[in-house]
Regions:
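Selective detector of the "anchor" transmembrane alpha-helix that sits immediately C-terminal
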Residues: 388-410, 473-479
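Short, well-ordered alpha-helical packing segments
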Residues: 336-339, 469, 485
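Bacterial N-terminal signal peptides
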Residues: 2-14
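Pore-loop/selectivity-filter region of tetrameric P-loop cation channels
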Residues: 370-388, 415-475, 479
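Juxtamembrane/interface segments at transmembrane-helix termini
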Residues: 404-420, 483-490
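Short, compositionally biased low-complexity segments
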Residues: 12-22, 408, 412-416
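N-terminal leader/targeting and pre-domain segments
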Residues: 18-375
Length: 490
């Protein structure tokens, strides 16, 4: 065991040394007194078919291996070096490994339409001017670990058949991956972007943007994520659009931070869209989206943030009503879809709250007419069928107010019955004014049964008030039973 403990650090260091892109030191750590090699000598050596193996050199002049050149069949390894002139290798096929790790490119670099049949290694490189990899074909793994692009760069229409690793890479200016195809896995873990575009890009395998930072505009419009995608803990400083994109697997946006509007209009999530603990400082636009299941547990919204669910089709939308109640862009169909969603989740109280707000906003926006008057009655009497307390209040209020009226207005008399004489017998004698308790008892009897107690009766105009209370009693009691049944029986 002691021997194993001593050997373990050595074995780990050797294993890390074999990871692509991690075995080359930073260019800054190398000596500045590097030998100078002319670009023409490099071209001549490539033409001779001899393998190239240089480290810590300076390549002077323009290195131009243009179209029409036969496939480069030998391996090329130029690491931790500096290219002072332009590097132009267009429509060139590299049959063996191309290893340019740790190099600094002081001028423009172009690998347009190149084919890399084996590994293409650009880890820890620094492109000070434009870098163009448009229409490039990577048949093997492509590693850009900790690579820095200080100017505009392009990977448009590029195809990555092997793993594409942009771990810890930095893009200090515009970069586009428009129409690119990632047929295996892709990693942009902890990458830093300014303006970036993945328009109509295809990710056939798993891809991660975990902890990536998007400081400029980020465009993922019409992008196809055919497998799982990870944006966990990513941060978007400016506008981000995923409009018309499709997600075929798990879409993990947990702990993400959108500081501006997050546009997901027209997207399609075929699997779980996980946004737990996300933060939205701007609006969340899901208009026209198709969601299989979207989870928004513990999300945080800015005070001015809005959520647009217009024309959104979702099977399961997991977010508590208290989180979004003041942020919904009003749309009747969206509200009713949320009500149905909450009922499917068996969150019945939240379904009631959502429906109540839907009706209240509709009432505020409706023009005056019989329809609005009917809505007002429905609101005040039973809270649109989801507020039992409203109906209970009106029952108690009606009993109390009529009791006060009968008592204060002396609207009822009471008989004192001597012996066991029947009502209407001559020995029945009217008594003095009834007490408030008797008036309240009389009001309860009229409200619940429309019949006065045997020893009391209304007088004068109060007969009509007693009849009106009986009618209101039947109305409110019937309404109470209906609303209570709807709330208790789900």
């Amino acid at each position: 065991m002691l021997l194993l403990a001593l050997l373990l650090p050595i074995l780990l260091s050797e294993a890390l040394a074999e990871v692509p892109g991690l075995d080359s030191p930073s260019p800054a750590s190398r000596s500045q007194a590097a030998p100078v090699i002319a670009a023409q000598d490099i071209l001549a050596q490539i033409g001779s078919g001899e393998p190239l193996n240089y480290d810590n050199v300076t390549v002077a002049g323009q290195l131009d291996l243009g179209p029409g050149v036969l496939p480069v069949k030998q391996s090329i390894r130029i690491t931790n070096s500096r290219f002072q002139g332009p590097l132009r290798m267009e429509a060139v096929t590299f049959a063996e490994i191309l290893d340019l790790r740790g190099c600094v490119y002081e001028d423009d670099v172009s690998f347009v339409k190149c084919v890399f049949q084996k590994d293409a290694k650009f880890s820890r490189a620094r492109f000070q001017k434009q870098a163009d990899f448009a229409e490039t074909y990577f048949q093997g793994p492509a590693s850009f670990i900790s690579t820095l692009f200080q100017n505009d760069s392009s990977f448009s229409n590029a195809q990555f058949n092997g793993d594409a690793v942009f771990l810890d890479s930095g893009f200090a200016s515009d970069v586009d991956f428009n129409y690119a195809r990632f047929l295996s896995s892709g990693s942009f873990w902890n990458a830093n972007f300014e303006d970036v575009s993945f328009f109509e890009t295809r990710f056939a395998g798993q891809v991660t943007f975990r902890a990536a930072k998007f400081r400029g505009n980020a465009t993922f419009a019409a992008t196809r994520f055919e497998s799982d995608v990870l944006f966990r803990a990513a941060r978007f400083w400016r506008g981000s659009t995923f409009g018309l994109s499709s997600f075929g697997g798990l879409a993990d946006f947990g702990n993400i931070n959108f500081q501006k509007t997050a546009f997901f209009g027209g997207v399609k999530f075929a699997d779980l869209a996980y946004f737990a603990n996300a933060r939205f400082d701007g609006d969340l636009i899901l208009e026209g989206a198709r969601l299989y299941s979207m989870q928004l547990d513990n999300v945080t919204f800015n005070e001015s943030s809005k959520i647009n669910l217009n024309s959104t089709d979702f099977s399961k939308f997991v977010v508590h009503w208290s989180t979004i109640r003041d942020r919904m862009v009003y749309n009747g169909a969206a509200y009713l879809a949320l009500v149905k969603n909450y009922k499917n989740l068996e969150w019945f109280d939240e379904a009631d709250e959502c429906y109540y707000q839907y009706r209240r906003i509709g009432l505020d926006q409706a023009p005056w007419g019989w329809g609005k008057i009917s809505d007002i009655i429905s609101w005040l009497s039973c809270g649109y069928g989801v507020r039992v307390s409203y109906t209970a209040f009106w029952c108690l209020f009606t009993i109390l107010i009529f009791g006060v009226i009968f008592w204060a207005g002396k609207g009822m008399n009471k008989f004192e019955i001597e012996g066991v004489e029947l009502p209407g017998y001559q020995r029945l004698k009217p008594s003095k004014r009834v007490s408030f308790t008797d008036a309240l008892y009389f009001s309860i009897a009229m409200f619940t049964t429309s019949q006065a107690p045997v020893n009391t009766y209304p007088v004068g105009v109060y007969k009509h008030l007693a009849m009106a209370e009986g009618i209101l009693g039947w109305f409110f009691l019937g309404l109470f039973v209906v609303v209570l049944s709807a709330v208790l029986i789900r």
